Amino acid sequence: MAHKKGVGSSKNGRESQSKRLGVKLFGGEVAKAGNIIVRQRGTVHHPGENVGIGKDHTLYALVDGVVTFRRGKENRSFVSVKEVVAEA
C-alpha cells in the first residue's frame, strides 16, 4: 500500500493574480492630464507627443486631449495625445 492519501488543499492555490495590463484609453477617446493610457510590461507602445512614461512603463497623458496611436520606424507603436484647443 505504498501510496499517498488525500493531499488536496495544501497542493492548490498557486495561480498568480492578473495584473490588469493593456490599453485603458483607445484611439479617439478623450484623455485628461494624468489619465493612464496603457499599462504594460516593457515598451510595447512608446510615448509620443504629450505622453509620459512611468518607471513601470505605464503611459499617461500630460495634457487634456484626444488619444492617437500610430506606427513609426521599425513598426513601433507610438501613443500621442493631440491637445484640443477650446474655442472662446
Swiss-Prot record:
Question: Which segments cross the bilayer?
Answer: none
Query: What GO terms in the biological process aspect are recorded for it?
Result: translation
For this protein, the record's PROSITE patterns field holds: RIBOSOMAL_L27
Q: Name one GO cellular component term.
A: cytosolic large ribosomal subunit
Keyword Ribosomal protein present in the record's keywords: the answer is yes
Taxonomically, the superkingdom here is Bacteria
The record's annotation in SUPFAM superfamilies points to: Ribosomal L27 protein-like
Query: What keywords does the record list, in alphabetical order?
Result: Ribonucleoprotein, Ribosomal protein
The molecular function terms of the Gene Ontology recorded here are: structural constituent of ribosome
Which InterPro entries does this entry report, sorted A to Z? Ribosomal_bL27 (IPR001684), Ribosomal_bL27_CS (IPR018261)
Family from the record: Belongs to the bacterial ribosomal protein bL27 family.
Please name the NCBIfam families in this protein's record. Answer: L27
Q: What name does the UniProt record give this protein?
A: Large ribosomal subunit protein bL27
- Species: Parabacteroides distasonis (strain ATCC 8503 / DSM 20701 / CIP 104284 / JCM 5825 / NCTC 11152)
